[in-house]
Amino acid sequence: MGFLSKFFGKPKLDYQSRYELLKAAISGTMSKVYQAKDRKTGEIVALKILDKQKTADLEMRFKGTKRPSEGEIAIQFDHPYIVRTLEYGTTTDNCHYIVMEYLGGTGLNNVLVHKQDLMAGARMFYIRQAAEALQAVHEKGFIHRDICPRNLIFTGDFNILKLTDFGLSVPNREPFTLPGNRTGTPNYMAPELVRRRNTDHRLDIFSFGVTVYELCTRQLPWPRGTDGLAAMSHDQPGAPITDFRPDINKKLASAIHYCIESDIKKRCPDMATFLRMIAKVEYEDEKSFADMR
C-alpha cells in the first residue's frame, strides 16, 4: 500500500465495512463521533466523521494558508493527557474521518452539571492534567482555539482527563494569528479573538482559565450566554472567584485570575508559568490545604 499511495494517494475508508458501530453517534458542532469496533482486530475506538459541508466552510476561512487538517495536527501528539489519534483520512463518501482511542468516560461539561461529587478532592489533579496537555499543544507550535469543558474528556475510571478536538486548531504563526477568524465557544473566548485583534497561544490560556474557574465553582466569570454576544463582556474584569468559592486556595485563585486577564499583555504568558504558580497547591480549598499541614 505504501508504494501505491505514492502514486494514487491514501485509499479511502469504507468505515461501515471496517467498523461495527456500537453506539449511536454523539453529534458535535462539525462532526459525529461513534463508539466503534474494528472488525479485523476487535479494537474498540472512537470514530469521528466530519460533516462535509461544515468542514468545507471552515477550510474556506483559511483558503490559501495551507492550514493543516485536524487529523494532521492531532496525530502529532503522544501525550498522556491528550486523546491519542490512531489514523485519519477520507471516507469513500468523501468525508474526513479520524480514528482515536476510546476513553469510555464523559466530558467535563457533563460532570460539571450532573456528577460534581466525582471531582471531590481531585480537582487539582484534573487541573494539572489539563494544563500539561495544553502546554504540550503550545510547545508543538499550535493554538487549540477551543479549550472548554466539552473538549476535556474523562477516562472510564475518571482517573485521567484528556484534551481532544483539534478541529479549530491552527499553527501559532502568521497568517493564522492575524485578525479576522472569530471561531470558538463564546463563553470561553478571549477578548482579542472576539474583537478581531491579533492572537497567539494566550487566547487558549484565557479559555483554560475560564474552564478552571468553572471547574472550581460551576459558575463563569461573566454572564453565561448562548451566542457570540456572550463573549462581548470579556474585555471587562470577571467576577472574583472568591464570590463563589470564599474558601478557594489563594495561590490557585491568583493563578486562575492571571489566566483570565482581559489584557493579553498582562495575562499569564504560558502554561509553564501557571503550573509553577500551583506547584505547591494540593487541594483547591484553603481548609483542606490547612489540614494537610
Please describe what each predicted stretch is:
Residues 108-118:
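AlphaC helix of the protein kinase catalytic domain
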Residues 132-142:
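Protein kinase catalytic-loop region centered on the HRD/HxD motif
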Residues 93-107:
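Conserved short submotifs of the Hanks-type protein kinase catalytic core
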Residues 56-76:
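AlphaC helix of the eukaryotic protein kinase fold
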Residues 84-96:
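Short beta-strand micro-motifs within the conserved protein kinase catalytic domain, predominantly
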Residues 126-127:
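Activation segment signature within eukaryotic-like protein kinase domains
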